[in-house]
Amino acid sequence: MAGGRYVEAVSEAEFRLGAGECLVLVGESGCGKSVLASALLGLLPGNAETAGSALLPDGLDLLAADEDTLARTVRGRRVALVPQSPAAHLTPVRTVRSHLEETVRELTGSRTPRAAAEAAAARAAFPASHLDHHPHQLSGGLAQRAATALALVGDAPLLLADEPTTGLDRDLVERTADELRAHTRDSGRALLMITHDLAAARRIADTVAVMYAGRIVELAAAEAFFGEPGPRHPYARGLLAALPERAFTPIPGAPPELGDLPPGCAFAPRCALADATCRTVRPRLTEGVACHRA
């Protein structure tokens, strides 16, 4: 930050994600979700520092890998990204087919990329009749499918989907969630989806990780989180209570600045259950929850 201050944008983020599984990372904007995804792909700003490890099944540590390794062997090949606002990531003067064929050439070295590009489009349910369209000719749903097709070209075993349903109509949200889930279930890929849309999370997740102020404060099976017994952390309970089909009760207050976190639980100033311990002692993630009162 300006003035030479350091900010822990993400800390104590620990989870496992297996083949064929979907973990959804939820939380308010600015809590560190996208920073975590950027760290896994080595896309943080040059002045950012990382610590810890992020291990792929073959033992490669994504946080320790150099740029050459990430560029040649990871991005698109072992870890693929479905970006937020996909239309903004497509070059406006090029067709969808051109984007796909270039990606095929880059990732596979093929000199005849047409068939592979069309196969990736088919897997993403992108219509062949629209392959020669430019980005401005695509609806939000088709732009999302184009981005998904680009992510599927390299057959990466891990997909990162960063807010893939943002800006979509509800029916497109449900369709996008279902399609991403199918890519995971049918191919054995792992999916890490980042979202603040709890309805989409409920539709797709095997596991839910709740982030607050840069930390994972709850990690739970989706069935238990959205059903019974429900969330254990007060912040996670507040997220569900704010849903329109539930109490529609907003969480009071606002998240703290990451550069000015309180000494204890970061949620304590907004929590009706907080006591002196909560305000002074930072809780650790234990048995799936980081809360003194859970």
Protein language model features and the residues they cover:
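ABC transporter nucleotide-binding domains
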Residues: 1-230
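Short catalytic/signature loops enriched in Gly
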Residues: 219-294
